[in-house]
């Protein structure tokens, strides 16, 4: 389509030139030469302006580099204001305040030297990216904001983040299939398949309480959950939140949840929560009141105005009977998962899990060993496997046989208060 039009245009110009006289052609040529000369002068002037602008930019960058020399003064954004200068301001006077005529956002900040500064010119940071509470680095003399700084957290909270993911798997846990399913439904599925809950219109639980006798696999289950999800894992211990100074424990809880929001999706695991979650009572001792304040801060973070659905809490305890009812109610730790003593079938499975990397004789009967370990928990069954291996090592054997396991049961049972019948 375009080729015939080009041919028509060129033929029209040829016809026009053919109809023009020689003087007209010379005049048109001079006009074109003048236009070309003017355009060349404009291009040359534009290039010179570009060079001068580049020089100015380079000078300004050098000045900025000089002004941005470390160290900075640290400050906090207190308030962000919108400047609207009056329209009827005097324009012909000599004493016009230029700062009062500026439009845009201004900042009130508080420095680490306890000075409150109003900045009509923000500095080198985009004002739209700032919000109250942000930590910024400012110039020591002009107080202009030079850079934004990362949020400040307690160093103890930063140490709670588990950088190396645990290596445990659900296959390392024996006899707790029902508990694994409940934990996956409450913690893992809302993070990996959130759309399934939205389709049903169901709000997933905020937290899970794992309770049961010692050695039944509560902490092991939390470690396996951390290994199976891509979420950040924060591990807190209940005694770690009990601090000497007033308000210190509550600040740790607050900083932990704030860090979890920035790292979301995140799982917070609080082991031995009975250290801070005991029932409240009237006490004149300041230490007891401080523990209660720490628990109240935990309750506020669980269901306060600042709660976040991308943060899940797993709490573990072996004394669920002494926990405060406010902590146990629905909406906070919604799902309670009990970890009972393992059954006979579960004990056989646990013994097989802990001995799968050992060189075990084929004649070892794990079902018979499970019948001999009535009332043993998971930790004691692991101790049985370790003792059996040590006994085989003591007699220079290359395999662990059934008698070694029986001797291991005897040694572990001797350390228990209750007497057990270890023969089937």
UniProtKB/Swiss-Prot annotation:
Q: What name is this protein filed under?
A: 26S proteasome regulatory subunit 6A homolog
Q: Which Gene3D superfamilies match?
A: 1.10.8.60, Nucleic acid-binding proteins, P-loop containing nucleotide triphosphate hydrolases
Tell me one GO biological process term.
Answer: proteasome-mediated ubiquitin-dependent protein catabolic process
Note the SUPFAM superfamilies from the entry: P-loop containing nucleoside triphosphate hydrolases
Q: Which UniProt keywords apply?
A: ATP-binding, Cytoplasm, Isopeptide bond, Nucleotide-binding, Nucleus, Phosphoprotein, Proteasome, Ubl conjugation
Please list the residues that bind ATP: 212-219
Q: Which residues carry this modification: Phosphoserine?
A: 19
Q: Which Pfam families match?
A: AAA, AAA_lid_3, Prot_ATP_ID_OB_C
Summarize the protein's role: The 26S proteasome is involved in the ATP-dependent degradation of ubiquitinated proteins. The regulatory (or ATPase) complex confers ATP dependency and substrate specificity to the 26S complex.
Q: Which family does it belong to?
A: Belongs to the AAA ATPase family.
Q: Where is this cross-link: Glycyl lysine isopeptide (Lys-Gly) (interchain with G-Cter in ubiquitin)?
A: 235, 279, 416
Q: From the Swiss-Prot or TrEMBL record, state where the protein is found.
A: Cytoplasm; Nucleus
Could you tell me one molecular function GO term of this UniProt entry?
Answer: proteasome-activating activity
GO terms for CC?
cytoplasm; nucleus; proteasome regulatory particle, base subcomplex
InterPro entries, A to Z: 26S_Proteasome_ATPase, AAA+_ATPase, AAA_lid_3, ATPase_AAA_core, ATPase_AAA_CS, NA-bd_OB-fold, P-loop_NTPase, Prot_ATP_ID_OB_2nd
């Amino acid at each position: 389509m375009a080729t015939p039009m080009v041919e028509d245009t060129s033929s029209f110009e040829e016809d026009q030139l053919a109809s023009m006289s020689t003087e007209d052609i010379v005049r048109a040529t001079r006009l074109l030469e003048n236009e070309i000369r003017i355009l060349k002068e404009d291009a040359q002037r534009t290039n010179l302006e570009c060079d001068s602008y580049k020089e100015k930019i380079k000078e300004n960058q050098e000045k900025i580099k000089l002004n941005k020399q470390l160290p900075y003064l640290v400050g906090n954004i207190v308030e962000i204001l919108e400047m609207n200068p009056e329209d009827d301001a005097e324009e012909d006077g000599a004493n016009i305040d230029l700062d009062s005529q500026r439009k845009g956002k201004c900042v009130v900040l508080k420095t680490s030297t306890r000075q409150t500064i109003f900045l009509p010119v923000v500095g080198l940071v985009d004002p739209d990216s700032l919000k109250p509470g942000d930590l910024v680095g400012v110039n020591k003399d002009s107080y202009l904001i030079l850079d934004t700084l990362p949020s400040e957290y307690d160093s103890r909270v930063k140490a709670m983040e588990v950088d190396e993911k645990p290596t445990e798997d659900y296959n390392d846990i024996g006899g707790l299939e029902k508990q694994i399913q409940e934990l996956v439904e409450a913690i893992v599925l809302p993070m990996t398949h959130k759309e399934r809950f939205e389709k049903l219109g169901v709000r997933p639980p905020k937290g899970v309480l794992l309770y049961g006798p010692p050695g039944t696999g509560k902490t092991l289950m939390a470690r396996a959950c951390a290994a199976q999800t891509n979420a950040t894992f924060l591990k807190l211990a209940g005694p770690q939140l009990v601090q000497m100074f007033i308000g210190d424990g509550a600040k740790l809880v607050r900083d932990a949840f704030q860090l979890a929001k920035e790292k979301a999706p995140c799982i917070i695991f609080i082991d031995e929560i009975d250290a801070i979650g005991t029932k409240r009572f009237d006490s004149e001792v300041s230490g007891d009141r401080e523990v209660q304040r720490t628990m109240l801060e935990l309750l506020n973070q669980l269901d306060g105005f600042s709660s976040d659905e991308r943060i899940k809490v797993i709490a573990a305890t072996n004394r669920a009977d002494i926990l405060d009812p406010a902590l146990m109610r629905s909406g906070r730790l919604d799902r309670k998962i009990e970890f009972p003593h393992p059954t006979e079938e579960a004990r056989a499975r646990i013994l097989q899990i802990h001995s799968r990397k050992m060189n075990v004789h084929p004649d070892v009967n794990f079902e018979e060993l499970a019948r001999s370990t009535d009332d043993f928990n998971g930790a004691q069954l692991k101790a049985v496997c370790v003792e059996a291996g040590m006994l085989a090592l003591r007699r220079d054997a290359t395999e662990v046989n059934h008698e070694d396991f029986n001797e291991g049961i005897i040694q572990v049972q001797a350390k228990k208060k209750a007497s057990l019948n270890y023969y089937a």
